[in-house]
Swiss-Prot record:
This is Protein BIG GRAIN 1-like. Residues 150-163, 195-209 have a biased composition (Low complexity). It is found in: Cell membrane. Keywords: Auxin signaling pathway, Cell membrane, Membrane, Transport. Its main location: membrane. Disulfide bonds: none annotated. Residues 137-146 have a biased composition (Basic and acidic residues). Involved in auxin transport. Regulator of the auxin signaling pathway. GO terms for biological process: auxin transport; auxin-activated signaling pathway; positive regulation of auxin mediated signaling pathway. GO terms for cellular component: plasma membrane. It comes from the Eukaryota. Belongs to the BIG GRAIN 1 (BG1) plant protein family. Residues 1-32, 120-163, 179-235 are annotated as: Disordered.
Amino acid sequence: MRDMEMRWAAPAPAARGRGRARRRAPDQPSFSSTLLDAICDSMDEGGEDGRTRNAASAAAKKRQEAANSYHYYYCYKPSLAASYRAAPALGSTADCPGRGYFSSSEVEYSLRRLRPIRTSAAGGAGDGAAVARKQRHEQPDVEKTAKTKPGSASARACRRPASPGARLASLLNSIFSGKRPSAQRPACSPDYPEPACSTAPPSSSSSYARRPCHAKTPRTPPTTTTTARARPSRSRTVRFLDIDGKVAVAAAVAGCRRIPVMEVEADTDDGGEESSDASSDLFELDSLAAIAPAGGRDGSYGDELPVYGTTGVGIRRDIGRRRPYGHAPCRSWSRAV
């Protein structure tokens, strides 16, 4: 028993001195034991190297995050987006930022192009004086360019698209300003005098009687030595025709002929059976045969069917008489065409 205790307790000091005992069989070491021994050795021997490696990876990660933040700030800022697009691509097609990849060389190039923004007045009065002198030196050049190219600023302003708000504001200003464009009359040329307007006195029934005609005296052209002959002044006369007057007078002057127009006056009796237009008039053949026998006066109504509206007794008598042209019941009048 004591020998067994001595055998188990003997390798303990060596294990404490080495740190961890290697569990390895002297004859046939297994794969798991070999892997475990390698892991333990790497942890014991490379403790300090692992710490430095972790610190280096953390620093590299921080630098990468900072570069990414600068990259996205520079790309999505509206004032710098155009310059970023115009910058030449330094990397390959795989490093193109449009495809979602990132290139540190592009970020360094873009960051070098950024200008520092001064946020505090720590520069002192010397820097302000230098800037003022620089502006004074640059001002004559600006004035010269403005004089040589007066239309460049206006053309640049015209190329800018107007926003809807600006258009609405200009429209409201033009409405409420109260300035209306004055109607400019075209200037008459001195060679051709303005014609005078003379009107004939129209009748009282004319619709144009109350419209005055502005008569102006012809302007005398200026006498110059270059004009060979003076042009005579011509006057034009405007006359208004009386619309409501007698048209027959104008027609007679124009040589129009009269065409007679007949207007037949129909005798209408309310409630009379003779002028009835009902369908029962078609069945009055017996009474009509008694009044106008077969053959009639000229034998024209014997075997005919009655016509609608002509089966009355009085109407058939009137038709049989055949009144001459211009009889009393008819009224004739003439119309000029």
